[in-house]
Amino acid sequence: MFIQTEATPNPATLKFLPGRPVLENGTLDLRDAEQAAQSPLAERLFGIAGVSGVFFGADFITVTKAAGEWQQLKPMILGAIMEHFMSGAPLLAAGSAQPSDADEFFDSADAETVATIKELIETRVRPAVANDGGDITFRGFKDGVVYLNMKGACSGCPSSTATLRHGIQNLLRHYVPDVTEVRPM
């Protein structure tokens, strides 16, 4: 098994591409060992000293470090990923549900505007962000403000504020005049 690695805009996060599907639907962002109990692979990764976050996408895994150098962490992370996939173990523990983004909020009168915002995020924003090892999902829309959840490499990335303000906000304002601002949640 060959696992590729890619740098992300966040220097504390690396993207690992195992060359096979990772998560069937959506994404899953795990920020501590307690949350990692949902996934045998995440438990293995959080067992490595210095790992502070694990994010699963359709065909990639991003790992965030709190401490340590990538030179020391990367071989251990690669080993844990390889062991997991070679064992045939499931990504999610029995009884763990696939992730859901059901807790959205917006006024029903804004449903058409929200549909346009979500389509732009799905078609223009998420594919670009996934290339960097992260994900951005719609959370809500209220009084002209779009609320987004930043996950994976995007969470805590030094350039995420610029991406949000200059990239995503400008895109949404261009296509959806009702949008005045974009904020992270």
Regions from the language model: what does each represent?
Residues 1-185:
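Domain-level signature for proteins that mediate thiol-based redox and metal-cofactor handling
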